[in-house]
Amino acid sequence: MAKNRFNQNWLHDHINDPYVKMAQREGYRARAAYKLKEIDEQDKLIRPGQVIVDLGATPGSWSQYARNKLAQGKKRDTQREGGIDGTIIALDLLPMEPIADVHFIQGDFREDDVLRQLEDVLEGRAVDLVISDMAPNLSGVASADAARIEHLCDLALEFAQNHLKPDGALLVKCFHGSGYSQIVEKFKQQFKVVAPRKPKASRDKSSETFILGRQLKQPR
């Protein structure tokens, strides 16, 4: 009974969520687009000519926002291939519906085949910005969930270390709670500038937060 009440309350909140309504109106696949938008407007992350990698991209709202941002200022028809000033590569274990001008690679980015596909698109270029909205399936067991969250952040940090430009940036989703301070410390070990971000589009009841790292301390 309590579970049904929880589901009904969540559905009510979701339907009446202004960000959900705005996403539907503006064509975004998820309200998460506005989290990235707010952080981008604050920190000026996305700029013309950049190479951007979106980890855990499905359903694609972050890639959509990045694509729209890179399309601004293009005089040609931005719905056609080549309609953005830059490159966006989206990766996920799950399938994703195509987005114009976004290269999608399905698979585990730790595997050689996926990395080869990534390198084919990069054509020797380093990455300006890595964004990760990856999140594990939470079990409700705090210690287990903290370990899963930290693992995903570790994967994003390793990917960034291997692919970012020296002055590049990494933005990842994490959660306040057990293990959060360890994640922040790992960011500080890897980046010169580290800042937490809690966009207004992130639900008040959620412990979700984001960590932004800029300028690698030891670029490869």
Curated annotation (Swiss-Prot):
Cleaved signal peptide residues: none
Any one cellular-component term (Gene Ontology): cytoplasm
UniProt keyword terms in alphabetical order: Cytoplasm, Methyltransferase, rRNA processing, S-adenosyl-L-methionine, Transferase
Location of the protein in the cell: Cytoplasm
Entry EC no(s): 2.1.1.166
Catalytic center residues: 173 (proton acceptor)
SUPFAM superfamilies on file: S-adenosyl-L-methionine-dependent methyltransferases
Superkingdom in the source lineage: Bacteria
Entry binding sites for S-adenosyl-L-methionine: 60, 62, 92, 108, 133
Catalytic activity from the UniProt record: uridine(2552) in 23S rRNA + S-adenosyl-L-methionine = 2'-O-methyluridine(2552) in 23S rRNA + S-adenosyl-L-homocysteine + H(+)
UniProt-annotated stretches for the region Disordered: 197-220
InterPro entries cross-referenced by the UniProt entry: RNA_methyltr_RlmE, RNA_MeTrfase_FtsJ_dom, rRNA-MeTfrase_E, SAM-dependent_MTases_sf
GO function term, MF aspect, one: rRNA (uridine-2'-O-)-methyltransferase activity
Gene3D superfamilies reported for this sequence: Vaccinia Virus protein VP39
Family: Belongs to the class I-like SAM-binding methyltransferase superfamily. RNA methyltransferase RlmE family.
Protein function: Specifically methylates the uridine in position 2552 of 23S rRNA at the 2'-O position of the ribose in the fully assembled 50S ribosomal subunit.
Protein name listed in UniProt: Ribosomal RNA large subunit methyltransferase E
Species lineage: Bacteria, Pseudomonadati, Pseudomonadota, Betaproteobacteria, Burkholderiales
